[in-house]
Amino acid sequence: FAIASTCSSSEFGTSYFQETNPIKLFSDCSGYNQIATTPAQFPRMLQGALQHAILKKEVAVLGIPGDLAASQPEENPTATFALPSRAIYRPLDSELQKFAELINSSERITIYCGIGAKEAHTEIIKFASMIKAPIGYSFKAKMAIQYDNPYEIGMTGLLGFPSAYTSMHESDLLILLGTDFPYEAFMPKECKIVQIDIRPERIGRRAKIDLGLGGDVKDTLQALFPLIYEKENDDFLQKQLKIYGKLKEKMAALADKKGSEKNIAP
């Protein structure tokens, strides 16, 4: 959420020194973008901006002219704290059954997590343990997914390791959890792909999806667990963890190398 200042409203449209138009400046990168010009507008617009930022997870921008910033505030006649209680959001049972059948019939499964999976760390670890799947993650999801995770194989993409890329391309089933990973070139073409996202309009815009499921990752996995059986063969998982381990050793060796005495290390 950003409050964008601009010149006094009396100077709008005069090419005044440092005059800006916040609407034009931020229209391409925001979901809520308004400019208040009266004290009565500002608190209502502020509430709307906060609700967009918190509830819709969109960038919100509220422009404020200099004269408005110096004026006396007015009481807000509408709500000032309107956060809904958490709702359960998951696919229909029939769709979950299709997902379970894909999992139960696959032998080489990789899980790839985005920031939309950040609240489901416990469920994702349990999921990976049941289906013997390595877990890759995006840069934004790293802090939420990597810790206390014995199944993690790092990131893919421009900042990633080859391990996650290799695992995704050697899978017969790739499961995308809460990710809008932007690089189509890094997505496998030969395996089946299932995508779960709380914003269904994002499903399928980075790869060809065999099954798209709208839902919260945590709610969806909790409902899925009774439908899948725990796999015993972990050969694929161990292979990918071994690849990741060797890559980490190689990176550590480069970092530990001191180089010449008078040069910057490494």
Regions found by a protein language model. Give the residues of each.
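Glycine-rich beta-alpha junction loops
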Residues: 7, 64-70, 115-117, 141
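Anionic-ligand anchoring segments at beta-strand to alpha-helix junctions in alpha/beta enzyme folds, i.e.
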Residues: 91-92, 98-170
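Structural signature of the thiamine diphosphate
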Residues: 2-4, 26-78, 102, 164-194, ...
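Active-site-proximal loop->helix
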Residues: 9-28, 147-151, 204, 208
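Phosphate/pyrophosphate-binding active-site segments
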Residues: 40, 63, 75-76, 87, ...
